[in-house]
Amino acid sequence: MPIRQLSETMINQIAAGEVIERPASVVKELVENALDAGASRVEVVTAGGGLNLIRVTDDGSGIPEPELALAIARHCTSKLAEDINDIRSLGFRGEALPSIGSVSRLSIRSRTALGDSAAEIGIEGGRVLPVRPAAANRGTTVEVRDLFFATPARLKFMKGERAESSATSDVVKRIAIAFPAVRFTLAGSDRSTLELPATDDSPEGSLRRVAQVMGAEFPDNSIAIDAMREGVHLTGHVSIPSFSRANALQQYAYVNGRPVRDKLIAGAIRGAFADVLPRDRHAVTVLFLTLDPAIVDVNVHPAKADVRFRDPGLVRGLIVGAIRQALADAGIRSATTGAAGMMAAFRPGAASYNHGGPANGHRSYEAAYRASGSAGFDPARSPQRPLDMQFGDFERAGARHGGFSEPGQAAFDTGPLVSADARVGQNETTETLLGTVLGAARAQVHENYIVAQTRDSLVIVDQHAAHERLVYEALKNALHSRPVPSQMLLLPEIIDLPEEDAERLAMHSETLARFGLGIERFGPGAVAVRETPSMLGETNVQQLVRDLADEIADNDTVETLKERLDKIAATMACHGSVRSGRLLKAEEMNALLRQMEATPGSGTCNHGRPTYIELKLADIERLFGRR
């Protein structure tokens, strides 16, 4: 077949294959156009999941009648002049409308503020219809019918009406979060309606919009983020660890107001929460990155969902550092949903409540820590043994999965987990303790739960979960406060790599050495590994080095090695912490509470579960009809 020029319709259908994946893609493009036109109100109506009908109406600036024909022509736009590096609008390609029109029956009805009347133009499967007069208020209405009728093969890849409607709802919510001053409504053929009243662009207004989309519980269980580094500004909110989800669907990220699904941002969020959430739990986040358009490329993907940063290491470091600092500043906060669930469980006929922790719930972890390690503490054999245990000797932790040292061997001794300063003296009155965050210990029930009292609440603490977090933080601080002990390999491991990967590893050799990995160049395209961290024991050195090379190439960091070491420290903490079934003295319980108050992040255990639940006195009184 000879080379020939494709028809305009075929070109637009090819472009539609990149831009218009499903009905939600159409809604995204049309809503972005409305916002670029300065709309303060956007209404979306769908039928048949968006395959039969999509109608988007706005009160924006409108399109002058002479420009309607240009609006549906390929690569015609009012949003971009000459500089592709200075993009400040959501759309800029000039591809969406002609692409949509090539696979559907499209009509555009618009009127400007100065126009005496409206005008309308249509396209059917790529065939342009003439402009004609119409009646309409100021703004634009774009109507898409019979999506993919011109490319019926695409219909085979569509999901059911409910799934397509859900995807459309997610798109509207994702965009609406970034534009709190705009009113959004979405109505579907299944009578589902989404209404998001306008707020304002202030931080408080933005948080109200987030609550409209993500639920009223999120603001009460989130931490504000506000950080800047080298001209990149990060704001938003992240959930406290105990308010997590089983998937990452409620992680929203924006770059200069543009909703994105970026792997670098997702990886940074996961890395920031690595210490406080297991890999099968995900934080709830709303993050806004504001930076110079010249240092971010939004012209990477036709759908504009991906971006590329000029300095990805800077962006990742900012996100990880800001979130970790916010979690540390939050102290021992725990999710309010746990207390709400407990109150609901007390009501007659109430179903059992899951506070949003790990999917298998408390019992799976309880069984794990009862069975792990040394089978727990037997009060009969070890009556009232104090809590000042010592954990250390990482050099002796070289078993296959990172063995566990004996108490008191102090190569990496973290000291007593409950220090003398933290113990409750005779001169510390109960009244003083009642004024603390976790209050005064009153009892221990089922040999695992500490019941404490504050001036206006009742606090229930899971002693194993709490002590596990304290041990982990102590081990981690010891681990990163000095070089990690390493073990010399009998024979160096020679690893062949692409030259650029070998060079990157050599450039980071000093950092890797602090983590116990001795690595050096070994000729062209190869490195020699002479030492590995003792904690890793018998490990696949080749895979570790290749993973590190990939991470350095992607993010210019060596977090993989640090995360592996932290994971072993977490396992050691689980085995080294006080078990369920351990009887505690009153001073030990109070000492544990005081150390929780002094340890950032102690409101959540290493598995993402809350370490304590607080019941307000007012809520308890309501249960008994006193309020």
Swiss-Prot record:
A single Pfam family it belongs to is: MutL_C
Known SMART domains for this protein?
DNA_mis_repair (SM01340), MutL_C (SM00853)
Q: Which GO terms describe its molecular function?
A: ATP binding; ATP hydrolysis activity; ATP-dependent DNA damage sensor activity; mismatched DNA binding
Q: Which UniProt keywords apply?
A: DNA damage, DNA repair
Q: Where is the signal peptide?
A: none
Under the heading Gene3D superfamilies, the entry gives: 3.30.230.10, Histidine kinase-like ATPase, C-terminal domain, MutL, C-terminal domain, dimerisation subdomain, MutL, C-terminal domain, regulatory subdomain
A biological process (GO) of this protein is: mismatch repair
Look up the domain of life of the source: Bacteria
- The keyword DNA repair belongs to this UniProt entry's keyword annotation: yes
GO CC, any one term: mismatch repair complex
The record's annotation in HAMAP family points to: DNA_mis_repair
Q: Which PANTHER family match?
A: DNA MISMATCH REPAIR PROTEIN MLH, PMS, MUTL, DNA MISMATCH REPAIR PROTEIN MLH1
Q: Which family does it belong to?
A: Belongs to the DNA mismatch repair MutL/HexB family.
NCBIfam families documented for this protein: mutl (TIGR00585), PRK00095.2-4 (NF000953)
Q: What function does this protein fulfil?
A: This protein is involved in the repair of mismatches in DNA. It is required for dam-dependent methyl-directed DNA mismatch repair. May act as a 'molecular matchmaker', a protein that promotes the formation of a stable complex between two or more DNA-binding proteins in an ATP-dependent manner without itself being part of a final effector complex.
Name it. DNA mismatch repair protein MutL
Native source organism of the sequence: Mesorhizobium japonicum (strain LMG 29417 / CECT 9101 / MAFF 303099) (Mesorhizobium loti (strain MAFF 303099))
